[in-house]
Amino acid sequence: MTIYNQSLSSKEYISHHLKNLQIDLRTFKIVQENDSSSFWFLNIDSLFFSFFLGIIFLLFFNYISKKFTIGTPGRIQASIEILVEFINSNVKDIFGHNTNKIIPPLSLTIFVWLFLMNLMDLIPVDFVPYIANFIFNISELRIVPSSDINITLSMSLGVFLLILYFGIKNKGIVVFLKEFFFQPFNNYLLIPVNLVLELISLLSKPVSLSLRLFGNIYSGELIFILISGLLPWWLQWILSVPWAIFHILIIILQAFIFMILTIIYLEMSLEKPDKNTI
C-alpha cells in the first residue's frame, strides 16, 4: 500500500511532505526512514531537481542564442534581452567600468537558476510526489531545491570560494593575509582581535546568503503544505491562490537578493588593498 492510499492525519501529512528522498552513501540504497541528521545521507531529490532545472536553463538559453536575430526580436528574445540588460546594468552600477568579464554571466546564471528553483514552490504540493509514487513507488519526495539548506549552503559556498579567489588574485596572498591580521586595528597587539573580527565578517557572508534564501523559500513551502494538510480540498483554493500570488514576489525577490549580494561581495573582493595595511 502506497502512502497515498493511506489515511493520514494532518500531522502525518505535513511531516510526510517535509521529508526528502535520501540515499545512504555507505550502501548506495534508498533510505527507508528519513533522517536529516546523518552525515552519510544525501537528499537526492534536491540534487536531481537542481541539476534538472540547471540543464533546462542551459538548453533554453542555448536555443535562444541560436535563434537570435538582429532585426525585430520575438517576444521571448525581447524578454531575454531585457533580463540580460537589467542584470548588466546592476553589475555596472556596482562595479563601474572595471567589471570582470565573468561577473555578468555568473550573475545571470545565479538569478535564473535560483528563480527556477524557487518557482517549483508554486507547483501543487501533491502533484509531482503523487506521480513519482504512482510510477516509481517513491514515498517521499520534495521538489523545491532551494528549500533544502544543503543546496542553498552549497551555492553560497561556491560564491565564498569565488570571493577568496578574486581577493587573493587581486591583492596577492601576502596582502590578503595581512588584512586579516591588521584590519580594522593596525596594531600588532590587536592581531587576535582583528583575526576574530575578520573571520566572522568573512564567514557571515555565505551563512547569511544561504540562510536568507532557505528561510524564505522553506517557510513559503511550509505554508502551502499547511494549507493542503489542514483544510479540505474545496477550501484550500481560498488561501492557496492569494498566497501563491504573493509568493511570486518572494520567488523573484529572493533570487534577486542572492544575485545582488553576490555581485557586491565580489566587488568588495576586487577592491584595491588598503595602503595603511602593514
UniProtKB/Swiss-Prot annotation:
SUPFAM superfamilies: F1F0 ATP synthase subunit A. It is found in: Cell membrane. The keyword Ribonucleoprotein does not apply. Its main location: membrane. PROSITE patterns: ATPASE_A (PS00449). GO terms for molecular function: proton-transporting ATP synthase activity, rotational mechanism. CDD domains: ATP-synt_Fo_a_6 (cd00310). Disulfide bonds: none annotated. Keywords: ATP synthesis, Cell membrane, CF(0), Hydrogen ion transport, Ion transport, Membrane, Transmembrane, Transmembrane helix, Transport. It holds the Pfam family ATP-synt_A. GO terms for cellular component: plasma membrane; proton-transporting ATP synthase complex. Belongs to the ATPase A chain family. PANTHER family: ATP SYNTHASE SUBUNIT A, CHLOROPLASTIC (PTHR42823:SF3). This is ATP synthase subunit a. It comes from Wigglesworthia glossinidia brevipalpis.
